[in-house]
From Swiss-Prot:
It comes from the Bacteria. NCBIfam families: PRK00249.1-4 (NF001304). HAMAP family: FlgH. The keyword Transport does not apply. A lipid is attached at residue 19 (S-diacylglycerol cysteine). Its main location: membrane. A lipid is attached at residue 19 (N-palmitoyl cysteine). This is Flagellar L-ring protein.
Amino acid sequence: MNRLLSVFALGGAVLLAGCVAPTPKPNDPYYAPVLPRTPLPAAANNGSIYQAGFEQNLYSDRKAFRVGDIITITLNEKTSASKNAGSQIQKNSKADIGLTSLFGSTPNTNNPFGGGDLSLEAGYNGERATKGDSKATQGNTLTGSITVTVAEVLPNGIIAVRGEKWLTLNTGEELVRIAGMVRADDIATDNTVPSTRVADARITYSGTGSFADASQPGWLDRFFISPLWPF
């Protein structure tokens, strides 16, 4: 019996451990800075006034549009969601069965034990009802800024950016990661773009240390709010 309880306890601990979010780790290669590609060798000077590779556009600004360029993304995210759900199911059923003949003949309904004649009539009456209500609300706000690098420039001019920021504090570390697609026209002259203009954005805000651990529920609390709780 004790061995069986130990097996159940170990299985429950493993299931609850799987509910814990993995701790973020630094130096993720996906968010590593992307360096500019090695430039091609410069063409030999042939003595002409206009040399290929030395041109300058008088009307273009210095927006980031090449691989390895730096862009600052201003974070201004605010989301809120609420959901209400209700269900009610009710079912009533009733059946009355009356038999006067059985296989074409009238059966004998005399009660051999006394107390009146037997009856072939039967009846059924049933009622079932189920009612449930649920409500959930959630809100998130994230403000700040993070500087990332251009990882890729697509043929249509869309820029893929990604990067991360780690802040080392006394009791742990704070992490901000972002990846997404930016349109060159949305980049301001100071190489900034709001996060609301980043398409297919993947924004992560997490941390490690005592502050991050304090915001996590304990293993027993996770059991009570998990699908394993039968009530």
